[in-house]
Amino acid sequence: MEHKAPLVEFLGLTFNLSDMLMITITCLIVFIIAVAATRSLQLRPTGMQNFMEWVFDFVRGIINSTMDWQTGGRFLTLGVTLIMYVFVANMLGLPFWLDVTVNFGGNRRPTDATVTLTLRDGRRPHHYYGVKMKGASDYLRDYTRPVAWLFPLKIIEEFANTLTLGLRLFGNIYAGEILLGLLASLGTHYGVLGCGSIPMMVIMVWQAFSIFVGTIQAFIFTMLTSFYMAHKISHDH
């Protein structure tokens, strides 16, 4: 039986309740982690505070690798928010993959292109800060550097970078979901034959690999966002 995600029409717009639920849960988890890690700060961090400081240091390293800290320090909060949201969204549903798939018609929200393409709109501040920090004239001249005939290619690059930022996350996570579905079907088939333990072991190994891929994708998404920001605000480009 085919399971479809619940849809609701409101003011001419279609809302996917599965997406809305999982996005809300993801945001709540990130918010709870942030509050739990910062509500009683200590000079010697332990537990959740230690974890949160590690995340901040990690994102600080990402920013430092793409731009100088004096310029990029203002984007630290953005980077931490992105990496935590994408990571939690990728992990959400892994322990209960079958239940979530059956009940909600979906799993981790990065498997929905609508969500990942919305996340890629995080590139919009790039243009704002590019104009603010370089000036409108200097910012626009970047599209004709080093030679004017590159202008059409620079426009294509803008759309390509924006599109691939979201589709890369969607494609990698969605491919993992498809393979998990195939392995689950394989487990059901061999379970009937009395050999279900072997496919289930394969599923567990693939789940572990999915955790690795989800973590890497959160890093790559944050790294590329920082890189694109540096590309827009740096005077070297």
Curated annotation (Swiss-Prot):
Species of origin: Bacillus caldotenax
Topology in the lipid bilayer: Multi-pass membrane protein
Subcellular location per the Swiss-Prot or TrEMBL entry: Cell membrane
GO molecular function: proton-transporting ATP synthase activity, rotational mechanism
Listed NCBIfam families: ATP_synt_6_or_A, PRK05815.1-4
UniProt key word Lyase: no
Encoding gene per record: atpB
Protein name: ATP synthase subunit a
Keyword Glycoprotein attributed: no
GO cellular component: plasma membrane; proton-transporting ATP synthase complex
UniProt-listed InterPro entries: ATP_syn_F0_a_bact/chloroplast, ATP_synth_F0_asu, ATP_synth_F0_asu_AS, F0_ATP_A_sf
TM stretches of this protein: 17-37, 78-98, 178-198, 201-221
